[in-house]
Amino acid sequence: MTQKKRSPSSTRWLKEHFDDQYVKKAQKLGLRSRAVFKIDEIQGKDKLLRTGMTVVDLGAAPGGWSQFAVEQVGDNGRVIACDILPMDPIAGVDFLQGDFREETVLGALLDRVGPDKVDVVMSDMAPNMSGTQQVDQARAMYLIELALDMCNQVLRTNGSFVVKVFQGEGFDAYLNEIRKLFSAVKIRKPDSSRARSREVYIVATGFKL
């Protein structure tokens, strides 16, 4: 059988990935992924996570953000995580594997959260990329709309929301939607986010509902 050759774009991505200083640093420190440096930088600027908080982490696998969050909230806090992909266990993290887009999975996640409101909703969700920007953008926007809907269901008054968003069609409308629901909204582009990536993080605090 002839081995399928990698496309130039995938070969370039692999080289960029393994040459990435943050990938190397994450491996050296035994961290789940380079994504932990993004939430670490956001935490340094915005102080979203504190001891004793309850946090929901959407799109959690392989666990970088959950790993960071559980260290921040400590033994008296809670981290409830969800992803369609499997994730190796992390002490102190209640992980649910399932497709967040499905009602049954959402129901199971809400059961894990319980009756009390949460302090922070985090979303690093991203769709499987097709390579067609219009399709990928629509899929990404759908996921972040679901994340915002999660805030409406579980986030306490004055709670916080941090979400990965890809700049493109629908971005401005989504940003305006968040500004109506939160007292303060900032856009962050962490140093560890690849420069050519369209991703930014919306950091919203002071939930009004």
UniProtKB/Swiss-Prot annotation:
Keywords: Cytoplasm, Methyltransferase, rRNA processing, S-adenosyl-L-methionine, Transferase. Gene3D superfamilies: Vaccinia Virus protein VP39. Specifically methylates the uridine in position 2552 of 23S rRNA at the 2'-O position of the ribose in the fully assembled 50S ribosomal subunit. Belongs to the class I-like SAM-binding methyltransferase superfamily. RNA methyltransferase RlmE family. Signal peptide: none annotated. The active site is at 164 (proton acceptor). This is Ribosomal RNA large subunit methyltransferase E. Its EC number is 2.1.1.166. One of its GO terms (molecular function) is rRNA (uridine-2'-O-)-methyltransferase activity. It catalyses: uridine(2552) in 23S rRNA + S-adenosyl-L-methionine = 2'-O-methyluridine(2552) in 23S rRNA + S-adenosyl-L-homocysteine + H(+). PANTHER family: RIBOSOMAL RNA METHYLTRANSFERASE, RRNA METHYLTRANSFERASE 2, MITOCHONDRIAL. GO terms for cellular component: cytoplasm. The keyword Methyltransferase applies. It comes from Aeromonas salmonicida (strain A449). S-adenosyl-L-methionine binds at residues 63, 65, 83, 99, 124. CDD domains: AdoMet_MTases (cd02440). Pfam families: FtsJ (PF01728).
